[in-house]
Amino acid sequence: MSSSPPPPKPHRRSCNSPGDSIPGWISESINSGSLRRVDLNSGTNGWASPPGSVFSLRSESYFQNRQKSPAGDYLLSPAGMDWLKSAAKLDHVLSRADNRVMQALRRSQTLGRSLKSFVFAVNLQIPGAKEHHSAVFYFATEEPDPVRTGSLLNRFVHGDDAFRNQRFKLVNRIEKGPWIVRKAVGSHSACLLGKALNCTYYKGSNYLEIDVDIGSSAIANAILHLALGCVTAVTIDMGFVVEAQAEEELPERLIGAIRVCQMEMASATVVEALHVPHVPRGVGWAKVNHHKSTDELTLDD
């Protein structure tokens, strides 16, 4: 395996900027996943962190003129990606004893470090006839500011699931890929995932995980399997946003973003499907499905 590229450029959170040290557990998370970090422009079969400027989000004056502007820095730092395969759907991956990101954080905390760290994970669950896949994207912070009391991200993390479903937005773009994939994905470049798909939220004391069931929408499932059919030729940027719906919430900010670079299906790590025990609401984590049968993606601007 080739060595990891140098630390990302300063378009992301400052802890990933040259000259700044990345916390050890985040560095471990970045470099130990089933998909390695690769060069932003030439890398294949891995992930990278695209500059926020490739995404257009609601600007400070959006509700006056509907103008968007290039996104700035991420609120949270990239902490790696997992590409997983299992005999059944993988739920609540951060609760697993073998989750490498939480293992790294726990090791750091046993040394008295990273005690205020917070992890945000998005688990895209991809159904299959015999095998299920999960693409899990991790973001993290050691600073309280991104999730400070009163911030939109704080309201999202600590809010109820009705609020989350109305606000959780994916913005995406095809960086490289066949015309048919560009056409299909381009028609759904911004989507309120909580309204279009079944989303399950798991909140722990120091994390929030969002499991997105791609199979709950026929259109989303068809688009994804179209892309997977030529996945080694596709590079896609995905950004995650809490949608601003009031002037005081503008401008919109990226929670985090990832570029998946010409991934190979065979790169998936095989993991055992575990039964997730039921925990009453308010004890440890919360789980709510946004039940909705739909063949239409909820598009957004």
Regions found by a protein language model. Name each.
Residues 2-142:
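Extended, low-complexity intrinsically disordered regions enriched in serine/proline/glycine/threonine
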Residues 104-117, 123-301:
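Extended amphipathic alpha-helical regions
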